[in-house]
Amino acid sequence: PGERADVVCFPECYIPGYRSPSRPVPPPDAGFLERAWSAIAAAARRHNVAVVLGTERFVDGALRLTALVLNRDGTAAGFQDKVQLDPSEGSLYSPGSGRRVFQAGSLKFGVAICHEGWRYPETVRWAAQRGAHIVFHPHFHEAEPGSYRPTVFADPANSFHEKAALCRAAENTCYFASVNCASEGSPTTSAMVAPDGTLLAYQPYGQHGLLVADIDISKATGLLAARCRSPYEDS
């Protein structure tokens, strides 16, 4: 009570649910998606909050993983499709193309979806180089049989993923907000990382809830992203 969010970010494909061979989800339904988006847009307008919604959409008959960005008045700012698919996703989804920077008031932000933020750091740098103060990272990650079950963020014994989240912020001097569903034993959790790579907050593992974090956009200078000499040239 009393906490007031300016932007709410949901995990990857929160609507209708992340698809995988081991996770049955009802067949893609464009009508259902439109109704769900409309309901969430109405809630955004009612509460005057911007939304980054992990979802899916059809483009020219092909199904894409995407994030729908809603303005505070409930209007659609646009989509950021997942461009770099995980190798396991190729039979279920089609890759998107292009990247965008969005704005909510004075806050500029980008979106890198799951695999993109973990293994393609240039997706985060692209946004930071164009003025993004924060990159939202909706993802889906759940426990696999026999996998390590962490209790502390970025545990050295855990997989590389949460260490990568710290790097994405530090290497670009921007905030990085990684957002996952809460599930028992998941190797990653939702977290907010500061522009110097320090952890601001994280959700206890497996615990349902809403992680709320305050940020200071004056600290998100994008300094290190701007200093990157790119493209690299052969010597």
Residue ranges and their predicted role:
Residues 1-4, 130-131:
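Glycine-rich phosphate-binding loop signature in dinucleotide/nucleotide-binding domains
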Residues 3-27, 138-142:
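Short, conserved active-site loops that position catalytic residues or coordinate cofactors/metal ions
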Residues 12-13, 55, 113, 139, ...:
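A cross-domain feature marking catalytic cores of carbohydrate-active enzymes
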Residues 32-52, 118-209:
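CN hydrolase (nitrilase-like) catalytic-core segments centered on the catalytic cysteine
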Residues 53-55, 66-69, 100, 190-192, ...:
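Short beta-strand scaffold segments in enzyme catalytic cores
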Residues 58-163, 222-233:
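Active-site catalytic loop in hydrolytic enzyme cores
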Residues 80, 102, 179, 203, ...:
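Hydrophobic residues at beta-strand termini and immediately following loops
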Residues 216-221:
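Juxtadomain coupling helices with adjacent low-complexity linkers
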